[in-house]
Curated annotation (Swiss-Prot):
Primary location group: membrane
Keywords, sorted A to Z: 4Fe-4S, Electron transport, Iron, Iron-sulfur, Membrane, Metal-binding, Oxidoreductase, Photosynthesis, Photosystem I, Repeat, Thylakoid, Transport
Single Gene Ontology MF annotation: 4 iron, 4 sulfur cluster binding
PANTHER family listed in its UniProt record: PHOTOSYSTEM I IRON-SULFUR CENTER, PHOTOSYSTEM I IRON-SULFUR CENTER-RELATED
Organism: Synechococcus sp. (strain ATCC 27144 / PCC 6301 / SAUG 1402/1)
Annotated gene: psaC
GO biological process, alphabetically ordered: photosynthetic electron transport in photosystem I
Protein name: Photosystem I iron-sulfur center
A GO-annotated cellular component: photosystem I
Amino acid sequence: MSHSVKIYDTCIGCTQCVRACPLDVLEMVPWDGCKAGQIAASPRTEDCVGCKRCETACPTDFLSIRVYLGAETTRSMGLAY
């Protein structure tokens, strides 16, 4: 299953998304673009299951991190309705 995790420059470096991820897909890396001096990164997207807990945990109202589900997941979710 392939999902895409996008981190945007509105990240405030709070680490909430990293702590919310049950599979350690995310990590913080140095970045001078915010006061915290760090930004979330997603080096292990192949482990992402698309639970979107990182999105829910983000205090910037989904403006900093988004999980785009792969087509296979989107199709199977449609069958549930």
